[in-house]
Regions:
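A glycine- and small-aliphatic-rich helix-loop capping segment at beta-alpha/alpha-beta transitions
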Residues: 25-34, 54-60, 115-125, 142-146, ...
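Short, ordered loop/turn segments at secondary-structure junctions
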Residues: 13-16, 41-47, 76-77, 106-108, ...
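N-terminal phosphate-binding or glycine-rich loops at protein starts, especially the Walker A/P-loop
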Residues: 2-49
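Accessory alpha-helical/coil subdomains and C-terminal extensions
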Residues: 103-105, 111, 115, 120, ...
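Glycine-rich oxoanion-binding loops at beta->alpha junctions
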Residues: 2, 48-103, 109, 142-149, ...
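Flexible, glycine/charged-enriched surface loops at secondary-structure junctions
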Residues: 36-42, 161-168, 219-222, 248-256, ...
Length: 328
């Protein structure tokens, strides 16, 4: 494989996700395999502006495939949104001999990469890393599978105490704009009800569902709630509302928060990261740019960055039906 590209930079940007380190490892080792150099860029786009670079080789990524977070760190950069900031970043890349970029992150990170690439005609490739699984052009993003396993493990433990005390637990999970975590983890954990941004269940229907569960003989219940659900109340306000209207329920709240982003990545995320990293580097070496590598129909595929940024993921309607049936 011949290419004008001799050195590739890799960075992580936006919210961290399990599997990012595995993706960094894959990018670095694929570069080494093709006998080109790789440079780690610390703290995302801010590190590009400040020239915070470090040469990376196969041994520098030993024993990170199992690590959560990102060894390259991540940071927001308002300066990168300015012409001056982008010019500084470009000048540093040129000074460092970097010919192309692999950006691991979400749609915000991809927006920055797309604009930068268009401004300076600089080759970029994106790898989707976010636990929310809300990026168009891939069935799975890095970290989603691990986050699901983390959430299910937490809910299983919550179920133990809920059953012991005949309580209703409202479990809030991440997902401001997308309910993929809530829906999949809710089904996997046997939740009695699931609230997501894509569906407006309504307070009346929620109360009816809880009353039905109680009448059917269920002594405890779990409601999984995406943080961006359309119910119109915070999870704590919802608790008060339920206790006011259904006083027979002893209701508790558990907000899982940032623990969903942490932890050792699952086998699926490690393999996914390895596959996407290889494809990202080899696509750049083939002369491709402004694409995101993702999974479509269980195959690694390229989606134009602009589509990944502007497209919208859809909830699997069949999962909604399965959830409804399983709550019987």
């Amino acid at each position: 494989m011949t290419s004008k590209i001799k050195k590739i930079g890799v960075l992580t940007s936006g919210g961290d996700a399990p599997g990012m380190n595995a993706a960094i490892r894959s990018v670095v080792r694929t570069c080494a395999y093709h006998k080109i150099e790789c440079v780690g860029i610390y703290r995302g786009y801010q590190g590009m502006i400040e020239g915070d670079f470090k040469e990376m080789g196969p041994r520098s990524v030993n024993n990170i495939i199992n690590k959560g977070g990102t060894i390259l760190k991540s940071a927001r950069s308002s300066e990168f949104r300015t012409d001056e900031g982008q010019q500084k970043a470009y000048d540093n890349l040129v000074a460092g001999g970097i010919d192309a970029l692999v950006v691991i992150g979400g749609d915000g990170s991809f927006s920055g990469a797309q604009f930068f690439s268009n401004s300076f005609n600089f080759p970029v490739m994106g790898i989707p890393g976010t636990i929310d699984n809300d990026i168009f052009g891939t069935s799975h993003t890095l970290g989603f599978d691990t986050a699901l396993n983390t959430v299910i493990d937490c809910i299983d433990k919550i179920r133990d105490t809920a059953s012991s005390h005949n309580r209703l637990f409202l479990v809030e999970v991440m997902g401001r704009d997308a309910g993929h975590i809530a829906l999949n983890a809710g089904i996997g954990a046997g939740a009695e009800e699931i609230l997501i941004p894509e569906e407006d269940l309504g307070l009346k229907r929620l109360l009816e569902s809880l009353e039905k569960s109680k009448a059917s003989g269920k002594s405890s219940s779990i409601v999984v709630i995406a943080e961006g659900d359309k119910i119109g109340k915070t999870v704590f306000e919802l608790k008060d509302y339920i206790e006011e209207n259904l006083p027979e329920y002893d209701t508790r709240v558990s907000v899982l928060g940032h623990m969903q982003r942490g932890g050792s990545p699952s086998c699926y995320d490690r393999v996914l990261a390895s596959r996407l990293g290889v494809k990202a580097v080899e696509s750049l070496l083939e002369g491709k740019s402004n694409f995101m590598v993702g999974m479509i129909n269980d195959k690694v595929a390229l989606t134009p960055l602009i589509q990944a940024i502007k497209g919208h993921t859809q909830i699997d309607r069949e999962l909604l039906r399965v959830s409804d049936i399983m709550s019987t």
